[in-house]
Amino acid sequence: MNGIEVLCQYQNGRKSFIRNSLSRIEIIQSDLSAVDFSRAELEWVNFSGTNLSRANLHRADLMHAKLIGTKLISANLKSADLSFADLSWVNCENAALVRADLIDTNLSGANLLKADLTDANLSGANLTGVNLSGANLSRANLSGANLTGVDLSGANLSRVDFSNANFEEANLVEVDFFRAEMSECNLQQATLIHTTLKGANFSNANLRGASLKGVVLKNLKNTLSMKSEFNIPELSQSDRLDLSGANLSGANLSGANFQNCSFRFAFMQKANLYKANLKDSSLIEVHLKNSNMQSANLNNSILSGINLQGTTMPDGSVHQ
């Protein structure tokens, strides 16, 4: 069947196209709401601008599909294969994308408000400017994904793999990063206010200019920590956040709770640590030049080889 035949049959009352082979058909700016394409072969189709709200695309093969500006509101895309597809400016509000394959998919400008992406694979996907507010990405794979300027406020990102992902200027307010893999991430100028980072791994992440005011970091479990080169028992604990080698230069960390955190070899020049809780933390070979540590809690912290030139100390004095 070609696109015209499918559309005519739909308009005449047919809603089920289960397991149909419909590769390369073109149906643009039409109404296919509530259609059933479950398990259908839809590789290379062009549904740009079409209304597929409430459609059933469970386990459909949509590799290389063109869905630019398509409406997929409340659609069922569970276990669908959308790898290499173009979903730019798509509306997937409240859509179910559980276990969906979105490898190298273009989702720039997409609306994924409250979408369920649990266990989805978005490695290498382009998520620039996407609205993921309130979305569930629990256990999803976003390694190497581009999330520049993305809105993830209030999203559940627990146990998500974000290694090497780009979060530059992203809105991460009140996001749950519980046990997330954030190593090598770019979080420059990102906003992480009131964000939960319990058990997350930020090894070698770049948080230059990021705002982490009010982040929740205490009582961490099962964090992936870098192996210590120092024979210090405290560093072998499994319940600490690892920010080893992270770039926090210029970051606003005022009032943040970093208790029992490892900052080994971190770059924190000009960082604002006013009233930050650094109790029991490891600050070995940290660059803190010109930072503000006024009223910070350093009780029982390990401090060794630190560059404190021009730093405002907890008592208000400036280190020379």
Where do the PLM segments sit?
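Tandem repeat scaffolds
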Residues: 2-320
